Regions:
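A glycine- and charged-residue-rich anion-binding loop/surface
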Residues: 40, 64-68, 72, 89-90, ...
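C-terminal tails and terminal domains of large nucleic-acid-associated
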Residues: 543-579
Length: 579
């Protein structure tokens, strides 16, 4: 009887699990946790934590570009407080591909948590290594893998599965855990005619489905788009049409990371006897890395320096450049405003913008197109022209992925909230129980056993803003001040008072920036000065001599008056000088 009780107790708390040929003993009390730190309810800064017991792996560490109201902010990265609190438990960072929204935060993460092994495919790590060196971060712990490779990290075994995307060498992940299998698709689509001839690995996903998948995390970016995403190869057909019609130079702007797109430009240039010049720092870096690693095939005599373009007839030159998003300092944008010192737009140039605007960049792209047209260029843009296709799976491809993997639980990831909801409904429409689908949010802790999934808590999460060299030192209060300055300007009120605060020794003087032009608003400024004087005298009459109280009264008095007269609320900065 005692033996039976002991055996029952052991069975209750301990189980034996065959795992990659080895046997592991694990306490059932330990749960599998999945914690998104970015990439849900937003486009960008993708980052997901997988935890079992005292072992953690991190999937991707991306950045996002600032929203319009984030004035002066350069980049946004995930809040990694949870990782800092558990840094001794992190066994590895595994990367799905080399886009900035998946690797861009790593220079900041690895500076704070060094010596973590980072695994990714060769192109992914080639791009990342350059980013780390630019930021002075050690790159010695990068470990390249190939599609089909399997690595061990703590209690996890991670497999890398080839997928098609708008960058070469992308992969999905299979993650064996003591609780069951997790599949993460990464950013993917099913391209049946890929440029490099390497399709998404259907068999690998199907085999995982046959063996049993506990949780699927899948790309939701195009969950609202019906049908199938066109093949990348169709862009090459559109390029050929444009090359055939072009009489002068061709300038093509695309994402620097889209190596297959660049390859199609090169192939078409060879066919039409045009030399290729590369413009833009990130474009030059990625092209050099891709040639070195063998992802981009370009005959040596095809590539010319940008300084050599005037040595060839215009109809024998094609320039591949950055600037497809209308970024203010990008090469194409500077060309559009005649501010590029090496390339000027000539009437008759054909400009191909081989990308669609990232949400929030529409105005920048539109302005660039207008400026190019004003200079006499022929501009080809927009999805209808066939010169761009998405790198993300549309609805029919998402259905295919679900049917291949057949998971017990599903977490839609990588998309704004409406994308995630659409993907969740799609999964439900093809037979997944609603209670097994988790529409999660950043910071939520999702906990799974073999039979049940639930939200069990929340960890610190959010956005860390990067402004120049400052990481996280700009918060909501600073942004609020910047917004106020950008909308209604600032008034600086300078008053000189005696040390004891008994009388005004000089002033007040008012300096205005971004509010009104003082010389054209003298009456307004004089009355404002009188309001300041009255506010100070009121304080002195009531024996109020604390500078902070006097400053607050000045702010309120002048703010009230200016709003009455102008319906504007400038930032008011009182300065009291002692004599």
């Amino acid at each position: 009887m005692q033996v039976k009780i002991l055996t029952s107790t052991i069975r209750k708390y301990i189980y034996k699990y065959k795992f990659g040929g080895a046997f592991f003993l694990a306490k059932e009390a330990q749960k599998l946790q999945i914690i998104p730190l970015g990439g849900l309810g937003e486009i960008g800064k993708n980052m997901t934590v997988v935890r079992y017991g005292d072992d953690i792996i991190v999937i991707d560490a991306g950045l996002m570009f600032p929203e319009e109201e984030m004035l002066g902010i350069d980049l946004v990265i995930p809040d990694i407080t949870y990782l800092l609190e558990n840094k001794d438990k992190i066994k590895a960072i595994v990367l799905t591909h080399g886009h900035e929204d998946h690797i861009g935060a790593l220079p900041y993460v690895l500076r704070q948590i060094p010596n973590i092994p980072v695994y990714g495919t060769r192109l992914t790590l080639g791009i990342l290594e350059g980013r780390l060196k630019e930021n002075g971060v050690d790159s010695s712990n990068l470990h390249p893998v190939y599609h089909g490779d399997i690595i061990s990290a703590g209690c996890f075994t991670v497999g890398f599965i080839r997928v098609n995307h708008s960058i070469a060498d992308a992969c999905g992940l299979s993650i064996k855990t003591p609780m069951g299998m997790i599949v993460h698709t990464g950013d993917f689509k099913f391209d049946y005619t890929p440029v490099d001839g390497k399709m998404t690995d259907f068999r690998a996903f199907s085999d995982l489905g046959n063996r049993g998948v506990l949780v699927l995390l899948a790309d939701s970016t195009n969950a609202e788009r019906e049908g199938h995403t066109p093949s990348e190869r169709t862009v090459g057909i559109a390029f050929e049409k444009a090359f055939r019609k072009a009489k002068n130079r061709i300038i093509i702007a695309t994402f620097s990371s889209n190596v297959h797109r660049i390859q199609q430009v090169v192939d078409t240039a060879i066919k039409y006897n045009r030399k290729v010049a590369i413009l833009g720092r990130s474009m030059i870096n990625v092209v050099n890395i891709s040639i070195k690693l063998g992802y981009l095939n370009m005959p040596e005599d095809m590539l010319i320096d940008i300084d050599e373009i005037n040595n060839y007839p215009m109809n024998q030159v094609v320039i591949i450049t950055t600037g497809s998003q209308g970024e203010p300092m990008s090469a194409l944008t500077r060309m559009s405003t005649a501010n590029h010192r090496k390339v000027g737009i000539v009437p008759g140039d054909t400009i191909i913008i081989s990308a669609t605007p990232i949400p929030g960049n529409e105005k920048l792209v539109s302005r660039t197109i207008d400026n190019l047209l004003k200079q006499g260029a022929d501009v080809i843009y927009g999805r209808d022209e066939g010169i761009h296709v998405s790198g993300h799976a549309s609805r029919e491809e998402l259905k295919l992925m679900h049917n291949l993997v057949r998971p017990k639980f599903f977490i839609p990831v990588h998309g704004e909230y409406h994308h995630i909801v659409k993907h969740a409904k799609l999964a439900e429409s093809i037979g997944m129980p609603k209670e097994n689908i988790f529409i999660s949010e950043i910071g939520q802790v999702l906990e799974f056993t073999r039979d049940k999934g639930q939200v069990v808590g929340k960890v610190t999460s959010g956005k860390v803003l990067i402004d120049g060299l400052g990481v996280g030192d700009v918060g909501n209060i600073v942004l609020r001040d910047r917004r106020q300055l950008s909308q209604d300007g600032i008034l600086i009120v300078v008053v000189t008072m005696d040390k004891e605060g008994r009388f005004i020794a000089a002033g007040p003087d008012i300096v205005s920036r971004g509010f009104v032009y003082v010389r054209e608003s003298e009456a307004l400024m004089e009355e404002a000065k009188e309001r300041v004087t009255s506010a100070i005298e009121h304080c002195l009459d009531n024996d109020i001599t604390e500078w902070s109280v006097i400053k607050n009264d000045i702010r309120e008095a002048i703010g009230r008056y200016l709003y009455e007269k102008t319906r504007r609320r400038p930032m008011i900065l009182p300065i009291i000088m002692e004599v």
